[in-house]
């Protein structure tokens, strides 16, 4: 059976991005994103709120863009996957583990007052170019036979604006 490792976050940066470069020159950017859940407590009737902090890492061009345009407090959309990495504590030498979100896509949200443009979407990897849809040569126009509504749903795909 296929598996899925997909994370989608919409939240606010808790601090300015930290950008560093690996020995081979690849950019690495770490950000901390807060998401907040709100609910009404059934027992007391009070509004409750819980904030969760997420460690997000971006690489290469996506990391450079994040470092340049993102600022503390900025609203952002992140799409990526969970990854747990193993590292050694410098003081004790003990093995440690960190689970973080490796971002594949980033979208800046909010307007100019939020510290940037009107939002720009960025992917870590270049998108695959799709071949343009092949359309048959124009045939002489004939009136289409009247069919019952929703009889052929495949024809409706051409009318969808997205």
Curated annotation (Swiss-Prot):
<keyword id="KW-0227">DNA damage</keyword>
<dbReference type="InterPro" id="IPR000424">
    <property type="entry name" value="Primosome_PriB/ssb"/>
</dbReference>
<dbReference type="GO" id="GO:0006310">
    <property type="term" value="P:DNA recombination"/>
</dbReference>
<dbReference type="InterPro" id="IPR011344">
    <property type="entry name" value="ssDNA-bd"/>
</dbReference>
<feature type="region of interest" description="Disordered">
    <location>
        <begin position="108"/>
        <end position="162"/>
    </location>
</feature>
<comment type="subunit">
    <text>Homotetramer.</text>
</comment>
<feature type="compositionally biased region" description="Gly residues">
    <location>
        <begin position="112"/>
        <end position="122"/>
    </location>
</feature>
<keyword id="KW-0233">DNA recombination</keyword>
<keyword id="KW-0234">DNA repair</keyword>
<comment type="function">
    <text>Plays an important role in DNA replication, recombination and repair. Binds to ssDNA and to an array of partner proteins to recruit them to their sites of action during DNA metabolism.</text>
</comment>
<dbReference type="GO" id="GO:0009295">
    <property type="term" value="C:nucleoid"/>
</dbReference>
<feature type="compositionally biased region" description="Low complexity">
    <location>
        <begin position="128"/>
        <end position="151"/>
    </location>
</feature>
<dbReference type="GO" id="GO:0003697">
    <property type="term" value="F:single-stranded DNA binding"/>
</dbReference>
<protein>
    <recommendedName>
        <fullName>Single-stranded DNA-binding protein</fullName>
    </recommendedName>
</protein>
<dbReference type="GO" id="GO:0006281">
    <property type="term" value="P:DNA repair"/>
</dbReference>
<dbReference type="InterPro" id="IPR012340">
    <property type="entry name" value="NA-bd_OB-fold"/>
</dbReference>
<dbReference type="GO" id="GO:0006260">
    <property type="term" value="P:DNA replication"/>
</dbReference>
<keyword id="KW-0238">DNA-binding</keyword>
<keyword id="KW-0235">DNA replication</keyword>
<dbReference type="Pfam" id="PF00436">
    <property type="entry name" value="SSB"/>
</dbReference>
<feature type="short sequence motif" description="Important for interaction with partner proteins">
    <location>
        <begin position="157"/>
        <end position="162"/>
    </location>
</feature>
<feature type="domain" description="SSB">
    <location>
        <begin position="4"/>
        <end position="110"/>
    </location>
</feature>
């Amino acid at each position: 059976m296929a598996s899925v490792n997909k994370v989608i976050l919409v939240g606010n940066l808790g601090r300015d991005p930290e950008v560093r470069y690996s020995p081979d020159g690849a950019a690495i950017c770490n950000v901390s994103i807060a998401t907040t859940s709100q609910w009404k407590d059934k027992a007391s009737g009070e509004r409750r709120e819980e904030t969760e902090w997420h460690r997000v890492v971006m690489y290469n061009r996506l990391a450079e863009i994040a470092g340049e345009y993102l600022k503390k407090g900025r609203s952002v959309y992140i799409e990526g996957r969970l990854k747990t990495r193993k590292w050694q504590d410098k003081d004790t030498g003990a093995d440690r583990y960190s689970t973080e979100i490796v971002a594949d896509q980033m979208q800046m949200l909010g307007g100019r007052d939020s510290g940037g443009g009107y939002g720009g979407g960025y992917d870590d990897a270049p998108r695959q170019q799709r071949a343009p849809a092949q359309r048959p040569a124009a045939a002489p126009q004939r009136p289409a036979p009247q069919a019952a509504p929703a009889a052929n749903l495949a024809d409706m795909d051409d009318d969808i604006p997205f």
